[in-house]
Swiss-Prot record:
Single Gene Ontology BP annotation: L-methionine salvage from methylthioadenosine
Enzyme Commission number(s) from the entry: 1.13.11.54, 1.13.11.53
Record text on cofactor binding: Binds either 1 Fe or Ni cation per monomer. Iron-binding promotes an acireductone dioxygenase reaction producing 2-keto-4-methylthiobutyrate, while nickel-binding promotes an acireductone dioxygenase reaction producing 3-(methylsulfanyl)propanoate.
Cofactors named for this entry: Fe(2+); Ni(2+)
HAMAP family: Salvage_MtnD_euk
Function description: Catalyzes 2 different reactions between oxygen and the acireductone 1,2-dihydroxy-3-keto-5-methylthiopentene (DHK-MTPene) depending upon the metal bound in the active site. Fe-containing acireductone dioxygenase (Fe-ARD) produces formate and 2-keto-4-methylthiobutyrate (KMTB), the alpha-ketoacid precursor of methionine in the methionine recycle pathway. Ni-containing acireductone dioxygenase (Ni-ARD) produces methylthiopropionate, carbon monoxide and formate, and does not lie on the methionine recycle pathway.
Name under which the protein is recorded: Acireductone dioxygenase
Record's keyword annotation contains Transferase: no
Originating species: Drosophila pseudoobscura pseudoobscura (Fruit fly)
Protein backbone atom coordinates (compact mmCIF):
# COMPACT_ATOMS: atom_id res chain seq x y z
CA UNK A 1 0.00 0.00 0.00
CA UNK A 2 1.29 3.42 -0.94
CA UNK A 3 2.68 5.69 1.80
CA UNK A 4 2.86 9.47 1.57
CA UNK A 5 4.73 11.96 3.74
CA UNK A 6 6.03 15.52 3.84
CA UNK A 7 9.72 15.58 2.98
CA UNK A 8 12.46 17.22 5.00
CA UNK A 9 14.45 20.05 3.43
CA UNK A 10 17.73 18.11 3.29
CA UNK A 11 19.24 18.29 -0.18
CA UNK A 12 22.80 17.18 0.50
CA UNK A 13 22.07 13.52 1.25
CA UNK A 14 21.18 10.63 -1.01
CA UNK A 15 17.90 11.27 -2.87
CA UNK A 16 17.06 7.55 -2.52
CA UNK A 17 16.62 7.85 1.26
CA UNK A 18 13.17 8.37 2.78
CA UNK A 19 13.73 12.04 3.77
CA UNK A 20 11.15 12.14 6.56
CA UNK A 21 10.60 15.23 8.65
CA UNK A 22 11.27 14.87 12.36
CA UNK A 23 8.83 13.71 13.58
CA UNK A 24 7.46 12.06 10.43
CA UNK A 25 4.36 13.76 8.98
CA UNK A 26 2.21 11.35 6.92
CA UNK A 27 -0.78 12.07 4.68
CA UNK A 28 -3.78 9.89 3.97
CA UNK A 29 -4.75 9.24 0.34
CA UNK A 30 -7.83 11.54 0.34
CA UNK A 31 -5.64 14.41 1.57
CA UNK A 32 -3.02 13.64 -1.10
CA UNK A 33 -5.74 13.88 -3.75
CA UNK A 34 -7.18 17.09 -2.31
CA UNK A 35 -3.76 18.78 -2.18
CA UNK A 36 -2.30 17.51 -5.46
CA UNK A 37 -4.83 15.67 -7.62
CA UNK A 38 -2.66 12.53 -7.53
CA UNK A 39 -4.84 9.42 -7.73
CA UNK A 40 -4.05 5.97 -6.34
CA UNK A 41 -5.39 2.51 -7.17
CA UNK A 42 -4.41 -0.93 -5.88
CA UNK A 43 -3.96 -3.37 -8.79
CA UNK A 44 -3.16 -7.09 -8.89
CA UNK A 45 0.34 -6.77 -10.36
CA UNK A 46 0.63 -10.52 -10.94
CA UNK A 47 -2.49 -10.54 -13.15
CA UNK A 48 -2.79 -6.91 -14.20
CA UNK A 49 -4.01 -7.85 -17.70
CA UNK A 50 -7.23 -9.16 -16.10
CA UNK A 51 -7.55 -6.63 -13.26
CA UNK A 52 -11.08 -5.13 -13.32
CA UNK A 53 -10.05 -1.75 -11.88
CA UNK A 54 -7.27 -1.32 -14.43
CA UNK A 55 -9.57 -2.43 -17.23
CA UNK A 56 -12.16 0.15 -16.22
CA UNK A 57 -9.52 2.88 -15.93
CA UNK A 58 -8.18 2.10 -19.40
CA UNK A 59 -11.65 2.13 -20.94
CA UNK A 60 -12.91 5.30 -19.23
CA UNK A 61 -9.75 7.33 -19.74
CA UNK A 62 -8.79 6.07 -23.17
CA UNK A 63 -5.44 4.52 -22.28
CA UNK A 64 -4.77 2.71 -25.54
CA UNK A 65 -0.99 2.27 -25.41
CA UNK A 66 1.21 0.79 -22.72
CA UNK A 67 4.78 -0.35 -22.35
CA UNK A 68 7.13 -1.53 -19.67
CA UNK A 69 10.18 0.13 -18.17
CA UNK A 70 12.77 -1.35 -15.84
CA UNK A 71 14.97 1.06 -13.93
CA UNK A 72 18.12 -0.47 -12.52
CA UNK A 73 21.81 -0.01 -13.13
CA UNK A 74 21.85 -3.33 -14.98
CA UNK A 75 18.80 -2.74 -17.21
CA UNK A 76 18.64 0.98 -17.97
CA UNK A 77 21.05 2.38 -20.57
CA UNK A 78 22.78 5.59 -19.43
CA UNK A 79 21.51 4.84 -15.90
CA UNK A 80 23.09 7.76 -14.01
CA UNK A 81 21.94 10.40 -16.50
CA UNK A 82 18.43 8.93 -16.74
CA UNK A 83 18.03 9.01 -12.94
CA UNK A 84 19.31 12.58 -12.88
CA UNK A 85 16.72 13.54 -15.52
CA UNK A 86 13.92 11.72 -13.68
CA UNK A 87 14.82 13.62 -10.47
CA UNK A 88 14.85 17.04 -12.12
CA UNK A 89 11.65 18.89 -11.21
CA UNK A 90 9.37 18.93 -14.24
CA UNK A 91 5.81 18.59 -15.48
CA UNK A 92 4.06 16.92 -18.42
CA UNK A 93 1.20 18.06 -20.63
CA UNK A 94 -0.50 14.66 -20.12
CA UNK A 95 -1.17 12.48 -17.09
CA UNK A 96 1.66 10.21 -16.00
CA UNK A 97 0.24 6.76 -15.25
CA UNK A 98 2.47 4.14 -13.63
CA UNK A 99 1.71 0.64 -12.34
CA UNK A 100 4.52 -0.90 -10.30
CA UNK A 101 5.01 -4.55 -11.25
CA UNK A 102 8.07 -5.14 -9.08
CA UNK A 103 10.50 -3.16 -6.95
CA UNK A 104 9.88 0.25 -5.45
CA UNK A 105 10.60 3.95 -5.75
CA UNK A 106 9.45 7.46 -4.93
CA UNK A 107 7.41 10.05 -6.79
CA UNK A 108 7.81 13.50 -5.25
CA UNK A 109 5.07 16.06 -5.95
CA UNK A 110 4.52 19.67 -4.88
CA UNK A 111 1.46 20.45 -2.78
CA UNK A 112 -0.56 23.67 -2.85
CA UNK A 113 1.98 25.33 -0.53
CA UNK A 114 5.01 24.27 -2.64
CA UNK A 115 6.06 21.63 -0.10
CA UNK A 116 7.44 18.33 -1.35
CA UNK A 117 5.34 15.23 -0.69
CA UNK A 118 7.07 11.88 -1.13
CA UNK A 119 4.92 9.03 -2.47
CA UNK A 120 6.44 5.60 -1.93
CA UNK A 121 5.25 3.12 -4.55
CA UNK A 122 5.64 -0.65 -4.40
CA UNK A 123 4.35 -3.66 -6.32
CA UNK A 124 0.65 -3.31 -7.15
CA UNK A 125 0.51 0.47 -6.72
CA UNK A 126 -0.90 2.45 -9.64
CA UNK A 127 -0.63 6.21 -9.43
CA UNK A 128 -1.83 8.88 -11.78
CA UNK A 129 0.17 12.10 -11.68
CA UNK A 130 -2.00 14.86 -13.19
CA UNK A 131 -0.87 16.94 -16.15
CA UNK A 132 0.65 20.24 -15.05
CA UNK A 133 1.93 19.22 -11.59
CA UNK A 134 5.60 19.69 -10.79
CA UNK A 135 7.08 16.37 -9.80
CA UNK A 136 10.13 14.12 -9.96
CA UNK A 137 10.98 10.43 -9.57
CA UNK A 138 13.79 8.51 -7.92
CA UNK A 139 14.54 4.95 -7.06
CA UNK A 140 14.79 4.07 -3.39
CA UNK A 141 17.77 2.29 -1.82
CA UNK A 142 16.75 -0.98 -3.52
CA UNK A 143 17.78 0.58 -6.87
CA UNK A 144 15.13 -1.32 -8.84
CA UNK A 145 11.64 -0.77 -10.19
CA UNK A 146 9.69 -2.37 -13.03
CA UNK A 147 6.55 -0.55 -14.13
CA UNK A 148 3.88 -0.41 -16.83
CA UNK A 149 3.37 3.01 -18.37
CA UNK A 150 -0.03 3.91 -19.84
CA UNK A 151 -0.77 6.55 -22.47
CA UNK A 152 -3.69 7.98 -24.42
CA UNK A 153 -2.68 7.25 -28.02
CA UNK A 154 0.96 7.24 -29.05
CA UNK A 155 3.32 7.70 -26.10
CA UNK A 156 4.48 11.22 -25.48
CA UNK A 157 6.83 11.64 -22.56
CA UNK A 158 8.15 15.16 -22.85
CA UNK A 159 9.31 16.67 -19.57
CA UNK A 160 9.04 20.44 -19.23
CA UNK A 161 11.53 21.47 -16.55
CA UNK A 162 10.57 24.11 -14.05
CA UNK A 163 9.69 26.89 -14.68
CA UNK A 164 6.92 25.99 -17.11
CA UNK A 165 4.12 28.07 -15.61
CA UNK A 166 3.11 29.50 -18.99
CA UNK A 167 1.89 26.12 -20.30
CA UNK A 168 -1.89 25.63 -20.52
CA UNK A 169 -1.67 22.34 -18.61
CA UNK A 170 -0.05 24.18 -15.68
CA UNK A 171 -2.72 26.89 -15.68
CA UNK A 172 -5.45 24.24 -15.78
CA UNK A 173 -3.76 22.29 -12.99
CA UNK A 174 -3.58 25.37 -10.74
CA UNK A 175 -7.28 26.08 -11.37
CA UNK A 176 -8.23 22.53 -10.34
CA UNK A 177 -5.88 22.72 -7.35
CA UNK A 178 -7.60 25.92 -6.17
CA UNK A 179 -10.88 23.99 -6.30
CA UNK A 180 -9.37 21.09 -4.26
CA UNK A 181 -9.67 18.76 -7.26
CA UNK A 182 -13.38 18.10 -7.55
CA UNK A 183 -13.22 14.47 -8.62
CA UNK A 184 -13.95 14.38 -12.33
CA UNK A 185 -12.28 11.07 -13.13
CA UNK A 186 -13.92 8.67 -10.70
CA UNK A 187 -13.67 5.00 -11.55
Amino acid sequence: MVKVWFMDDEQETDQRLEHHRSPPDYLELPELYQKTGVEYFKINADDYQNDAILGELRAKRGYTYDDEITCSEKCLPDYANKLKNFFTEHLHTDEEIRLVLDGSGYFDVRDNEEQWLRIQVVKGDLIIIPAGIYHRFTLDSNNFIKARRYFVGEPVWTPHNRPADDLDCRKSYLKHQAESFVQLNQV
